[in-house]
Amino acid sequence: MSKTSESKQMAVLRFIYERVNEKGYPPTVREIGEAVDLSSTSTVHGHISRLEKKGYIQKDPTKPRAIEVTPAGFEALGVETTPHQIPVLGTVTAGQPILAVQEATDYFPIPKELESFGGDLFMLTIRGESMINIGIMNGDQVIVRRQSSADNGDIIIAMTDENEATCKRFFKEADHYRLQPENDTMAPIILNNVSVLGKVVGLYRDMLFQ
């Protein structure tokens, strides 16, 4: 590949990155062409295809405009993934090392009101109905701020002494910790020791009305 072509390819990658950060969604092929001075949409498609093969972007075949810059793409551009991107670290499940950023399955545009938290944020997908009374449903994604302590009443992600990650409301009581579900049919978890991984500060629900 010529240096000119490679430079144009990186211009395409940077425009995709900048548009997603600015608007929260990727540009159209025509918008990419206009931004990097390419009149041929087939040429733009060619650059997009090569960027995907390099692992710099990923496309969702079920969504026509779903283009995301990958961690490798961020590195190629020399930009940080924060504060504009939150790593999505999978599901709250037993025994998983969910706080390793290299385990990120995706990246999510950070809401403007949470930008001050910067790289201290991550997202997890909730499995189960233990928090339905406060509107956290099965399949929701929660935005979590990394912290190792919590105040009574905080909604947290914690690692229990059975090495299971869970989302509950936190209470420090006389001689134990109580992890309280927000579901009237479920009992609290009582623990002698608990490891706080972070405090839930936001929620995202992917809803499609047809």
Swiss-Prot record:
GO MF term list: DNA binding; serine-type endopeptidase activity
Source taxon at top rank: Bacteria
Role: Represses a number of genes involved in the response to DNA damage (SOS response), including recA and lexA. In the presence of single-stranded DNA, RecA interacts with LexA causing an autocatalytic cleavage which disrupts the DNA-binding part of LexA, leading to derepression of the SOS regulon and eventually DNA repair.
Endpoints of the signal sequence: none
NCBIfam families: lexA
Annotated SUPFAM superfamilies: LexA/Signal peptidase, Winged helix' DNA-binding domain
Keyword flag Transcription regulation: yes
Keyword DNA damage in record: yes
DNA-binding region in chain numbering: 29-49
UniProt xrefs under InterPro entries: ArsR-like_HTH, LexA, LexA-like, LexA/Signal_pep-like_sf, LexA_DNA-bd_dom, LexA_repressor, Peptidase_S24_LexA, Peptidase_S24_S26A/B/C
Catalytic activity: Hydrolysis of Ala-|-Gly bond in repressor LexA
UniProt subunit comment: Homodimer.
Enzyme kind, highest EC tier: hydrolase
Pfam family, any one: Peptidase_S24
BP-aspect Gene Ontology terms: DNA repair; DNA replication; negative regulation of DNA-templated transcription; proteolysis; SOS response
Family: Belongs to the peptidase S24 family.
Species annotation: Lactiplantibacillus plantarum (strain ATCC BAA-793 / NCIMB 8826 / WCFS1)
Protein name as it appears in the record: LexA repressor
Residues at the site labelled Cleavage: A94, G95
EC number(s) on file: 3.4.21.88
Keywords of this entry: Autocatalytic cleavage, DNA damage, DNA repair, DNA replication, DNA-binding, Hydrolase, Repressor, SOS response, Transcription, Transcription regulation
Active site, UniProt feature: S130, K168
